[in-house]
Design a protein with these regions (language model features):
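A short C-terminal helix-loop "cap" of Rossmann-like NAD(P)-dependent dehydrogenase/epimerase domains
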Residues: 176-190
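N-terminal Rossmann NAD(P)H-binding glycine-rich loop of SDR-like oxidoreductase domains
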Residues: 3-26
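NAD(P)H-binding glycine-rich loop region in Rossmannoid oxidoreductase-like domains
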Residues: 36-37, 43-101, 112-122
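Conserved Rossmann-fold NAD(P)-dependent oxidoreductase catalytic core, especially the SDR/UDP-sugar
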Residues: 76, 90-163
Length: 320
């Protein structure tokens, strides 16, 4: 039985990835800061939960040792420069170093659509820049070296760049529907930003297919994960309200804000307690269309037909 380490496996996407890996016969190791974070997954046969801080380099090396493959899903949407650097750049560097040191043969890294590993500093947000820098670190490592580590060897690398991900437990369409239950009218920052939403199950399947060698592209390979339809943010907010049956089935009125008001709204939301719905960095990220560029292969290169959003979202938003 092949062994795999799934980093970030307790999250929305990670849970689906773990379930699919177990079904495919992998022995899954799932590190988490608190065992309780993995309560929903501990019933899976062949899955081992370990309490571990993966940002601790020594602890990470211990859990990487003996694995055949690693999946990295660790990511944040909000934070300051230091937080993005720690999560999206420093952690991939530590993962790469550990993979090289312990002879791990495969790494699947889930990044983000809209980033650029070649020129990350040209990107408009901390999120996208850090994602691109993290990709660059891994691409260098896949060829056999991590700067300053002295380790050599290389590994098979798949970088997956999904658009915004939807599914029954998402913090995307569900949030928009919830807001429309509270507010009769929604002023919206970034209303014209473009997205090509991809179903969480398609993303999880893509991870498993990469591990199975389904892609014919040479390593390191980058694959864009998108759905079949492009929406503006305003359309997605309106659709979530409609599918939830709000406003008589028409959703609440949604109107886009001018740039100055959008930045003010995003700034105020970013200061609110708890995880913000939006921040100024999110708004900056939306300057880059979150749609397929056509420069890289997509889901079809892995034998996956992209799932349409509306029939799936209706199933979990209807009557909420």
């Amino acid at each position: 039985m092949k062994k795999i380490l799934v980093l970030g496996g307790t999250g929305f996407v990670g849970a689906h990835v773990c379930e699919k890996l177990v079904r495919e016969g992998w022995a899954v190791t799932l590190p988490t800061r608190r065992r309780s974070n993995a309560n929903a997954l501990q019933h899976l046969p062949g899955l081992t939960v370990l309490e571990c801080d993966v940002h601790d380099e020594a602890a990470l090396a211990q859990v990487v040792a003996g694995q055949d493959a690693v999946v990295n899903l660790v990511a944040i949407l909000h934070g300051n420069q230091a937080a993005f650097e720690r999560t999206h750049v420093a952690l991939p560097r530590k993962i790469a170093k550990a993979c090289l040191a312990h002879g791990v043969k495969q790494l699947v890294h889930v990044s983000a659509l809209g980033t650029d590993a070649l020129q990350p500093q040209t990107l408009p947000s901390m999120y996208l820049r850090s994602k691109g820098e993290g990709e660059a670190v891994l691409i260098q490592a896949a060829s056999g070296a991590v700067a300053g580590s002295g380790e050599r060897g290389g590994f098979d690398l798949s970088i997956l760049r999904p658009s915004v991900i939807f599914g029954a437990q998402d913090k995307f369409l569900n949030v928009f529907a919830k807001l429309q239950k509270i507010f009769p009218v929604l002023p919206l920052a970034g209303a014209n930003a473009q997205f090509q939403p991809v179903w969480v199950q398609d993303v999880a399947t893509a991870v498993v297919r990469c591990l199975a060698g389904a892609s014919q592209a040479a390593s390191p390979r980058t694959i864009e994960l998108v759905g079949p339809e492009v929406f503006t943010l305003k359309q997605l907010v309106q659709l979530s309200g409609q599918l939830a049956g709000l406003g008589g089935g028409f959703g609440r009125p949604v109107f886009g804000l001018p740039d100055w008001a959008a930045r003010l709204q995003a700034k105020l939301m970013g200061l609110a307690p708890g995880e913000p719905v939006m921040s100024t960095d999110n708004l900056d990220s939306m300057k880059v269309p979150n749609v397929a560029t056509g420069k890289f292969p997509g889901l079809d290169s892995l034998g996956i037909t992209a799932s349409a959003l509306q029939p799936i979202a209706q199933g979990y938003l209807q009557g909420r």
